[in-house]
């Protein structure tokens, strides 16, 4: 049942029926002494984030856990309730591909807007209608680079998300392409001298995290220049997409392909997924791009409509000619990101990104006061690595206090600087000053 508020005419008609002059007359039987003759003593209005923070404070009287300080590719962010409410609409509530445009205009238009958002944030010309996740998008970018250049070597930064690198290795195992991994330096950025040495005439692409797995904003322009000189493409992979509200777009820094995940927009952590992957590139590469594109067109009556176009996947064309076998993908998750980004707007996204960076700086200051130095000196967004002495022990200890600490870096990089004590920690808009101080104090104790 839909809710329609009463108009003044509706109220007047109802009062006339019961013989009352005004609404207050309906409460005449209540003694005056029992009526409230002053405004309610309520606190000032609060935005959703502050309201949820207060509700969490009240709920903390029970056995509960704080927003996790672990990121590592999947981040805790506030998801406005309206996102889930819109997803529940019958027109949208399916992850299935809108093959029949005549009955799927709403979904197709939403995917079209998703592509617009992806292009705006990445500085690219074209985007597809989403991928499974950031890892498969990265692997598909390497395959596309091989098709475009005709080369069989992929150079990857060791600071790229380890799980992205594993999926990439799985994809390229069957193609026979060589993967060369380049180390990172003391600042947490890709070692450019090693990159220069690794890139040659066989290199199809160079892949960097932006920001990378260590939370560091990598040297994307310099890496792109090295790749371009050798005739290779540059792929930027972004796991924390909120960073694109503050950092310069990958396309503006020389990247030829921008991939990653929009989990940070409209999608909860959900123990690691699902979350929509994005894929964007230059217009000249559009016919080599995997997946599907939602396009705008006009029908024979001249009316604007939306359709799937450039669907060069194995269900649509001959398998050996297909650019991808990506199927139903993460359409519903992409819709959630689209709704969230629509609510934020350009200014809201910039404010959210600045807030995330501010909280990360606050965490850095608190951890340094607690005696935990940052391991890497490179620029960061909302994630950093700290030396806490014994990362695994700290994680176990804080878990008993209801605090989900960061990710021990030694699980992926046993030979990294300060590996035993290295703890990868993220701070977002959900981590207020009190929680950050609580975390730093718990680590120190």
Curated annotation (Swiss-Prot):
Gene3D superfamilies: Aspartate Aminotransferase, domain 1 (3.90.1150.10), Type I PLP-dependent aspartate aminotransferase-like (Major domain) (3.40.640.10)
UniProt cross-references to Pfam families, sorted A to Z: GDC-P (PF02347)
Molecular function terms, GO-annotated: glycine dehydrogenase (decarboxylating) activity
GO BP term (any one): glycine decarboxylation via glycine cleavage system
SUPFAM superfamilies with a match to the protein in the record: PLP-dependent transferases
Family: Belongs to the GcvP family. N-terminal subunit subfamily.
Identification of the protein by name: Probable glycine dehydrogenase (decarboxylating) subunit 1
Source species of the chain: Anaeromyxobacter dehalogenans (strain 2CP-C)
Gene of this entry: gcvPA
């Amino acid at each position: 049942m839909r809710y329609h508020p009463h108009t003044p005419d509706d109220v007047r008609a109802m009062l006339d029926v019961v013989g009352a002059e005004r609404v207050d007359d309906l409460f005449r039987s209540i003694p005056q002494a029992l009526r409230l003759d002053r405004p309610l003593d309520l606190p000032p209005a609060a935005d959703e984030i502050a309201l949820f923070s207060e509700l969490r404070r009240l709920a903390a009287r029970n056995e509960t856990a704080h927003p996790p300080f672990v990121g590592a590719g999947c981040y805790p962010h506030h998801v406005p309730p309206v996102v889930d409410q819109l997803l529940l609409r019958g027109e949208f509530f399916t992850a299935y591909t809108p093959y029949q445009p005549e009955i799927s205009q709403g979904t197709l238009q939403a995917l079209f807007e998703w592509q617009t958002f992806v292009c705006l944030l990445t500085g690219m010309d074209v985007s597809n209608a989403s991928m499974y996740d950031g890892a498969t998008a990265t692997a598909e970018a390497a395959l596309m680079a091989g098709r475009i250049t005709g080369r069989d070597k992929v150079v990857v930064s060791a600071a790229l998300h380890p799980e992205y690198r594993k999926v990439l290795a799985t994809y390229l195992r069957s193609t026979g392409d060589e993967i060369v991994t380049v180390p990172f330096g003391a600042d947490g950025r890709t070692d450019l001298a090693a990159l220069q040495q690794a890139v040659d005439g066989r290199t199809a692409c160079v892949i960097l995290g932006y920001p990378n797995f260590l939370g560091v904003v990598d040297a994307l322009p310099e890496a792109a220049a090295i790749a371009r000189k050798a005739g290779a493409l540059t792929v930027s992979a972004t796991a924390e997409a909120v960073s694109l509200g503050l950092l310069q777009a990958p396309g503006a820094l020389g990247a030829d392909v921008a991939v990653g995940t929009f989990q940070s927009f409209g999608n909860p952590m959900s123990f690691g997924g699902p979350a929509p992957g994005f894929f964007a590139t230059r217009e000249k590469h559009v016919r080599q791009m995997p997946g599907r594109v939602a396009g705008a067109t006009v029908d024979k009556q001249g009316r604007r409509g939306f359709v799937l176009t450039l669907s060069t996947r194995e269900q649509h064309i001959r398998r050996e000619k297909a650019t991808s076998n990506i199927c139903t993908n993460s359409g519903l998750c992409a819709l959630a990101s689209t709704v969230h980004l629509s609510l934020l707007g350009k200014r809201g996204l910039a404010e959210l990104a600045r807030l995330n960076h501010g909280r990360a700086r606050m965490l850095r200051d608190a951890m340094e006061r607690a005696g935990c130095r940052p391991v890497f000196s490179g620029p960061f967004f909302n994630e950093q690595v700290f030396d806490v002495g014994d990362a695994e022990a700290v994680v176990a200890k804080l878990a008993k206090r209801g605090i989900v600490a960061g990710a021990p870096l030694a699980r992926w990089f046993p030979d990294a600087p300060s590996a035993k004590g290295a703890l990868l920690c993220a701070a977002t808009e959900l981590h207020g000053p009190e929680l950050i101080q609580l975390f730093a104090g718990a680590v120190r104790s």
